[in-house]
């Protein structure tokens, strides 16, 4: 059995970080749910939490959420919606309830795109509300490397201070952070209490494997159980996380990621 298969007790991981829809700053090929279903089958993944890529850049994400639910309806056995809720927008509380009633598996938020910093009260209110309804807050550090971004994309990366403050502000909320690298993960992890760390997971879509071996280092220092499987398709290659797991050193051959399905049930 490979390390990639050990990522999940069933041998088929669940991808917490995929997106559908166009990207506003460059062409992204085939970001469609029917293509995604075939990609998941090819990669041996049992399903995915799916966000709507353009909604991150809408002032009002409501139409994007409607488009997400409609697009995923034929594929709900495999694709679970993860809509975004903007907490400084009118009637966001109702939008959150509606999303959960429609089967949202997690709620995405995009603080950099919405101009929200570490002490933004609306972001903290959203985090607390997500905890109250027993859902999961999903944050995204970045969509592209800074060196790739177009001049119109002026939002920076999600910073460590905002992640820490958000986790601290909502003691009943589970948080999954996607697209973070080793430095960001360490800045956040070592700045939290053990109880706070226990409610926080990281996907592995942006963590380097060999020769830097950042993934192996993080498994040894934080524990593999703090990480979940994520690819950030279609922005990144779906094969990269699996390859990085397969290339883990021998001393980590029994390392096992947290299962996103189990996080849902906590």
Model-identified regions with their sequence ranges:
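Mid-to-C-terminal alpha-helical segments outside catalytic/metal-binding sites
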Residues: 1-18, 25, 30-47, 97, ...
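Histidine-centered divalent metal-coordination motifs
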Residues: 17-23, 140, 179
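Active-site neighborhood of phospho(di)ester-bond hydrolases with catalytic His/Asp-centered motifs
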Residues: 13-16, 49-52, 82-84, 108, ...
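Conserved, mostly hydrophobic/aromatic
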Residues: 17, 40, 68, 72, ...
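Generic structural signal for well-ordered alpha-helices
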Residues: 33-40, 65-72, 96, 123, ...
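Active-site gating/metal-coordination segments in enzymes
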Residues: 46, 59-145
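Catalytic pocket-lining loop regions of alpha/beta-barrel enzymes
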Residues: 106, 119-228
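Acidic-and-aromatic substrate-binding clefts and catalytic sites of carbohydrate-active enzymes
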Residues: 24-31, 55-63, 85-93, 114-121, ...
């Amino acid at each position: 059995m490979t390390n990639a298969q050990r990522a999940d007790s069933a041998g088929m991981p669940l991808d917490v970080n995929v997106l559908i829809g166009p990207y506003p700053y460059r062409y992204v090929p085939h970001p469609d749910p029917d293509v995604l279903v075939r990609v998941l089958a090819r990669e041996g993944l049992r399903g995915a939490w799916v966000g709507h890529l353009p909604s991150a850049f809408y002032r009002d994400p409501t139409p994007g959420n409607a488009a997400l639910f409609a697009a995923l309806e034929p594929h709900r056995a495999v694709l679970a919606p993860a809509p975004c809720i903007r907490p400084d927008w009118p009637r966001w509380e109702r939008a959150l309830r509606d999303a959960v009633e429609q089967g949202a598996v997690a709620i995405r938020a995009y603080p950099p795109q919405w101009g929200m910093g570490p002490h933004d009260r609306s972001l903290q209110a959203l985090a607390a509300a997500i905890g109250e309804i027993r859902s999961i807050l999903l944050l995204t550090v970045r969509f592209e490397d800074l060196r790739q971004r177009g001049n119109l994309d002026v939002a920076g990366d999600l910073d460590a201070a905002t992640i820490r403050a958000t986790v601290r502000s909502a003691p009943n909320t589970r948080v999954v952070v996607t697209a973070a690298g080793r430095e960001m993960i360490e800045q956040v992890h070592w700045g939290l209490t053990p109880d706070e760390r226990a409610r926080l997971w990281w996907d592995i879509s942006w963590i380097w494997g060999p020769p830097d071996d950042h993934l192996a280092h993080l498994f040894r220092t934080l524990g593999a159980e703090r990480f979940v499987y994520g690819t950030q398709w279609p922005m990144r290659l779906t094969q990269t996380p699996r390859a990085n797991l397969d290339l883990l050193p021998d001393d980590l051959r029994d390392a096992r990621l947290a299962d996103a399905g189990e996080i849902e049930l906590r």
